[in-house]
Structure formats: C-alpha cells, structure tokens
Amino acid sequence: MENLKNRTAREVLDDHLNLAQKWEGAEVDLETVVRDDLERNVSQEIVVLTNRGTLHGYQGVMELALMLGEELPEHNAFQYTYVSAEGRMAFLEWAHVDATTRVRDGADSYLIEDGTIIVQTIHYTVEQK
C-alpha cells in the first residue's frame, strides 16, 4: 500500500483534481468518486468554508459535492485555469461550462498537512446562460 502521508501539497492537490475530473458524465456515480477522494486526500476533520456556509468532515464534503452536482447537472469536466502550491498551501482557479450554466470565477484554497486536505475554501458563482 502506498504511503499517502508523505506527499507534498502539490501531489495531494494534483491527486484531488485528477479524481474530481472523474465525475464527468451523467452516468458517473458522484458519491463513489467523492468517497475515493475522501479516502486518499481529505482529513476526516476537514473544515470547508464557502459562500454557502461552513461544512465539516466527510459528510460536509459529500453534501457540498452533491450540491455542486445539482448546480452543474451536465457534469462536464472542470477547466483548471491556475494551479499552485507552496509549503502547506495550495490554490486553484477553475471554470466550468455546459449547455445551460457556467462558472467563470471558481477559486479554491487548501491547507494540506500529512498528505491530507485539512481546510479548504471554495468560491464560485453559477451563471445561467
């Protein structure tokens, strides 16, 4: 079994982002994709700060993922427009486009320790086309 605790912040972020791209397509089981990500990359005590509220733990991450799945129902791939990491911190800018909605201002930040995301901030605005 691979040792995930010794990964750099960038390695954790890259793994998280690669798994997030697996949600593409309506036939994908979003909960399975999220569970895989939780097991590999997310602390059980994670705190997620969003413009929709503060969420805690695996249950909070799952709630947020399901909400995002409803807001972006075509489940197209995310476009990662900027990715960086330094020390324990990482930052992501992202966008999403489908037939009826778009996100142009996605911005997430991450605090990563011992190979897991312990704090994440998320901001995005869903626009109807």
Pin down the residues of each PLM region.
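Short histidine/acidic/glycine/proline-rich micro-motifs that form metal-
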Residues: 22-24, 52-55, 97
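Low-complexity, compositionally biased segments
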Residues: 17-18, 40, 54, 101, ...
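A beta-strand edge to alpha-helix "cap/lid" segment located at domain peripheries
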Residues: 1-8, 62-129
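Hydrophobic alpha-helical core bundles mediating ligand binding, dimerization, or RNAP-core interactions
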Residues: 13-20, 42, 65-69, 92
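Short, low-complexity N-terminal intrinsically disordered segments enriched in polar/charged residues
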Residues: 1-40
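A solvent-exposed, acidic/Ser-Thr-rich amphipathic alpha-helical stretch
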Residues: 32-86
